[in-house]
Swiss-Prot record:
It comes from Kluyveromyces lactis (strain ATCC 8585 / CBS 2359 / DSM 70799 / NBRC 1267 / NRRL Y-1140 / WM37) (Yeast). GO terms for biological process: rRNA processing. This is RNA exonuclease 3. Its EC number is 3.1.-.-. The keyword Hydrolase applies.
Length: 478
């Protein structure tokens, strides 16, 4: 009784994928007895007529995978009740998994062995969700080829392959011919249904307040003249006289806030690796500046620089906008220096301006903002808001989408209650997820690789919401 196995024949030289065993009967042997043969990656079996009497004519060859077999001895393979007769010996016979070969390419982004492994992994994952073996084999090679075509380096190939394998599991193999998730047809394609779903995602007043949003126009307390002029530096936490903010000093700080390292079990600064327990100079700060900076959080303090505006009196039709701002430290605190607004329905940027701050510039935060220079002709916040706070753009009926929108609305000096904040919708435990991580996890998109781009961030936050509502990201007509 022969074991039940799958058998595939490849007429060209190929890598042998894994170790298998099968029973083989040499039809030219007078003894007609069966012989069990092992085939592994580093060895194969050929039949050499000159050695027919030795080991029944079978000779093991090592490390010769790419050389074609030239012997012409014919043989018969009995496998269960199926008989394969008169197979030329140059054929490589494999059993177990089918032959999985990547599509040949002139310029391969990764070594051939890596591509073979990826095809195998795709096939293995697809078998969990689909039963049609020929379809799975074809899909595995096609999807791997799609990954290889867009990859420029070995690293990008591995990254894109991991995304594909993740999507196969996430969508249970329900991907299109390019390896992308299939768009589910639903009523969400209708604009009215999309609006209904978007309204269900709006944050309530309690959630807004808990996450730092100003939910109404608060009464501003009169500024106490006897109040101390000393404030805490936002970067190094040193107390300093805000009236002397432009006077040169030494501000040592870390570019990134400390986080807990699970391996070292210490709170460390990811910008330089220094920990709170270290006593080196770098532990005090890996960056040095000539001025301290501050950031008002109080409604009254913020209003003393630029008054807030409520959108209650700004009439207009209901629209959906995604926005993001870039900020800088100035002598007047934390000010907006760029604003980008994107239309949800068309995915087009409808407003994008560099804003001239009211205070004297101390730090443009160029590493994060991407702004290195602001021209004197750039509009101020008072001039710019006449363009973006209007019936045709941001009005009382606008649904605003963004990530960490409390910061954006604060520097824009806007009080609004129709807000969808991806930082709140997708928390990371007791903390908020970064837009960079959200974009990677949900959109399989890498952003903020270097300097931030407000248009890139606004579109990413918008696409996260579209993905949540199963809206095709390329849909621009409604």
């Amino acid at each position: 009784m022969y074991p039940t196995l799958n058998l595939a024949v490849c007429l060209k030289s190929s890598h042998l994928i894994s170790s298998h065993r099968f029973c083989l009967k040499n039809s030219q042997s007078t003894e007609k007895h069966q012989k069990e043969i092992n085939i592994s990656v580093k060895e194969r079996y050929t039949c050499n007529p000159s050695h027919r009497q030795k080991k029944n004519g079978w000779v093991r060859e090592k490390n010769a995978l790419r050389e074609p077999l030239t012997a012409s001895l014919k043989f018969t393979i009995h496998l269960n009740s199926i008989v394969f007769r008169y197979i030329p010996l140059y054929a490589i016979i494999m059993v177990g998994n089918p032959v999985l070969r990547p599509v040949d390419m002139k310029m391969q982004p990764a070594p051939y062995q890596d591509r073979v492994r990826v095809v195998q992994k795709i096939y293995t994952q697809l078998k969990r969700f689909q039963s049609s073996s020929p379809h799975i084999i074809k899909a595995s090679t096609i999807w791997e080829h799609e990954v290889a075509k867009i990859a420029k380096t070995r690293q990008s190939y591995a990254f894109n392959a991991s995304i594909l394998l993740r999507d196969i599991v996430k969508y249970k193999g329900n991907l299109d011919k390019t390896g992308k998730p299939k768009n589910n047809s639903s009523s969400l394609i209708q604009r009215s249904h999309v609006l209904q779903k978007l309204r269900s995602l709006l944050l309530d007043e309690e959630t807004l307040s808990r996450n730092g949003f100003f939910v109404k126009m608060y009464d501003t307390d009169p500024i106490n003249e006897s109040e101390s002029d000393y404030v805490e530096c936002y970067r190094c936490e040193t107390k300093f006289d805000v009236t002397k903010i432009m006077e040169p000093t030494v501000c040592r700080y870390h570019l990134q806030r400390k986080v807990y390292n699970r391996e070292t079990k210490k709170r460390e600064f990811p910008c330089c690796g220094a920990s709170l327990e270290s006593y080196s100079d770098i532990s005090a700060g890996c960056m040095k500046a000539k001025n301290h900076v501050y950031k008002w959080e109080n409604f009254t303090k913020l209003s003393s620089v630029v008054p807030f505006k409520s959108l209650v009196d700004i009439k207009g039709e209901e629209n959906v906008l995604a926005l993001d701002c870039e900020m800088a430290f100035t002598s007047k605190g934390y000010e907006m220096i760029r604003i980008t607004i994107v239309d949800f329905w068309s995915s087009e940027v409808v407003y994008d301006k560099v804003i001239k701050p009211l205070g004297e510039i101390i730090d443009l935060n160029s590493k994060f903002s991407g702004i290195h220079h602001i021209d004197d002709t750039a509009p101020t916040i008072h001039e710019a808001e006449k363009c973006y706070i209007c019936p045709s753009m941001i009005n009382q009926n606008s649904i605003l989408i963004g990530h960490g929108l409390d910061n954006d609305l604060r520097v824009m000096r806007i009080v609004h209650d129709k807000v969808i904040d991806t930082a709140v919708l997708y928390p990371a435990g007791k903390y908020k997820s970064s837009l960079k991580n959200l974009s990677f996890e949900i959109l399989s998109r890498r952003i903020q690789g270097g300097e931030h781009d407000s248009s890139e961030d606004a579109i990413a936050a918008m696409d996260v919401i579209k993905k949540k509502l199963s809206i095709p990201l390329d849909k621009k007509s409604w």
